[in-house]
Amino acid sequence: MKRGLMTFSVALLLVASPIAPAGAQPVSFTDPDDVNLPLDLKTLTHDHNDSAITYTVETYDPFADSQVDFKWGIDKNGDGKVDFFAAAGYEDKALEGKVEDTKDKELGKATVRRVNDRAIQLSFSRKLLGASYQYWVMAATDTNGNEEDDPGEFDLAPDAGFHPHQL
């Protein structure tokens, strides 16, 4: 994943968005078929056990491994600001995952696995989170090849605010 995880103009929109109340585990939510991109988010799921957080993302259409570019913006303290990112991408002919702070410093490894031709899972250590947090998911499609997330090149879910995850 050559692109930094800080390149989100959408983060500014989220800061002013309302925060949803805490929910139970495991949880799925859906996003409408609302963008004309290969990575149009459909169903997003979060789950956890004693050691790991697992996110599953499904799109409306099939996608190749080389198109994988998913980012979860995570707010650990409920202030409506992203504290770090978990990401799944494609590098050196393989799927890879990582967890980084907002300045691209790696905080931990993440494991990516293919679920089917429309879905992947990303797992990382639960130690990186507190008792509860909230997140949003972004799927990017670099249509102009500049390795940046430009307007019109991504789908965001939820469309406003964050989705809660109670541990």
What name fits each language-model region?
Residues 76-89, 129-167:
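Acidic/polar low-complexity flexible segments
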Residues 15-22:
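C-terminal segment of classical bacterial N-terminal signal peptides
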Residues 24, 92-105:
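Solvent-exposed beta-strand/loop surfaces of large extracellular or lumenal domains
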Residues 9-14:
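Hydrophobic helical h-region of N-terminal Sec-dependent signal peptides
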Residues 99-130:
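Acidic, glycine-rich flexible loop segments
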Residues 26-93, 143-147:
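Surface-exposed, glycine/proline- and aromatic-rich loop segments on solvent-exposed faces
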Residues 59-61, 124-128, 139-141:
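A mature extracytoplasmic/lumenal domain signature
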Residues 1-8:
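Bacterial N-terminal signal peptides that target proteins for export
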